[in-house]
Amino acid sequence: MLKIFNTLTKKKEIFKSIKCGEIKIYVCGITVYDLCHLGHARTFVIFDTILRYLKHYGYQVKYVRNITDIDDKIIQRAIKNNETTDHLASRMIQEMYLDLDILNILRPNYEPKVTDHIELIINFIRLLIERNHAYVTSDGNVMFSIQTVYNYGVLSCHKKNQTFTQRNIRNKMIKKDPVDFVLWKTAKSGEPYWISPWGKGRPGWHIECSAISHAFLGKHIDIHGGGSDLVFPHHENEIAQSTCAHHITVDSYVNTWIHTGMLTFNDEKMSKSLNNFFTIREIIQKYDPETIRYFLLSAHYRKPLRYSDNNIKNARLSLKHLYSALHGINFNPIVQLYDNNSEKYFISKFNNKMNNDFNFPEAYSILFEMAHALNIAKIKDHVRAKSLAAHLKYLANILGILYQDPEIYLGYNTCIKNNKQSLTVEKIRELIYMRENARKNKEWQLSDKIRKRLTEIGIILEDKPTGKTIWRYN
């Protein structure tokens, strides 16, 4: 029985989907003005793992994650870079895919961009105006009236006067009430804009998620999530917009709110605004992507996770332990899962840990129990060893790990020599990553040059439709 902590009710609840066997999930995506940082990675690795487990549990999952490709930050960065907002956003979206793919994060079913859905956002705003929850100001902005929402603050427990004190004290927009927030923002001279009933402008940040989630998932959503920093004001404002637009209750809008803990560095939240962040691109120059993924799941998803080199090195040691257990096993792809009572026992324990609010660290502990049993079986019972190894890889796949050849990960062939040149596995991965980036940017000459170099030293590349590349020794 799956239990999930619901941010709305502040307690663990037995999860029951709106429609039997199906789950609709909406997660707030990235504002694409810069490279993804490790805080983004933690949130998306967590929801990727939740998605994988729900599928393992038997659900059909419809997963939507939006892309904010127009925003004040995007406009400011485009001006700084002397490029258009379209070009900047498009470039950063491709970089985002490179970063998330390399962490073995599955693509959502839908990734709607805001600029592709301006009309439906305008219609959503129009509906709020018709129902007297929004108004047009003299300077052409459209504002949401928080005073029309009797239970504003239900998710975050913020009171309306706190909203003004903490968030809007510096906001110079014309409003009926200082706590009101913008739905449609009038474009300044030289800024990108779209034509609306209220003049030239662009959507506010909060309205895009209400409009897009409704368009793709309907009025009622099973799971809505994001980082804990989105609880207020973003998700609070989403609740206000969506419940007012559709005349629905808060708990019928979203069954379960899931929020991930922050990644911390020097006891502060890792974020771009504090300028204390590391990009995914920077981190994978030091550590392999699978180690990073393991690390990001090493604390309970609702708790803060402290970034340190020691913590990541410990994650790598843990992975090495698991890969060492798998080393030397000739995998039989037709091994039948669940065909042994012992393996059923491990799977049941794994499910119990994950059913308890997706307890990833406890789920890891089951993998180590299996690795211990596997090491014994490799000596005493080779048939059972193969079965245990297959089940270990199956459960690890739910966590998005142990997808590599153990020999490659452990470095038994870390050095390939050709014409007195050598490449470590880490260098091979780096070259493949560079080639993936070149292909994304249509730099075909560079892509071919990297492939040729790897081919010359006995590396075979296989490009997947997702854009990822798998490699092996010839």
From Swiss-Prot:
One of its GO terms (cellular component) is cytosol. A motif ('KMSKS' region) lies at residues 269-273. Binds 1 zinc ion per subunit. It catalyses: tRNA(Cys) + L-cysteine + ATP = L-cysteinyl-tRNA(Cys) + AMP + diphosphate. ATP binds at residue 272. SMART domains: DALR_2 (SM00840). A motif ('HIGH' region) lies at residues 30-40. It comes from the Bacteria. GO terms for molecular function: ATP binding; cysteine-tRNA ligase activity; zinc ion binding. Its EC number is 6.1.1.16. It is found in: Cytoplasm. It is an enzyme of class 6 (ligase). Its cofactor is Zn(2+). One of its GO terms (biological process) is cysteinyl-tRNA aminoacylation. Pfam families: DALR_2, tRNA-synt_1e. Keywords: Aminoacyl-tRNA synthetase, ATP-binding, Cytoplasm, Ligase, Metal-binding, Nucleotide-binding, Protein biosynthesis, Zinc. Zn(2+) binds at residues 28, 209, 234, 238. HAMAP family: Cys_tRNA_synth. NCBIfam families: cysS. Monomer. Belongs to the class-I aminoacyl-tRNA synthetase family. This is Cysteine--tRNA ligase. It comes from Blochmanniella floridana. The gene is cysS.
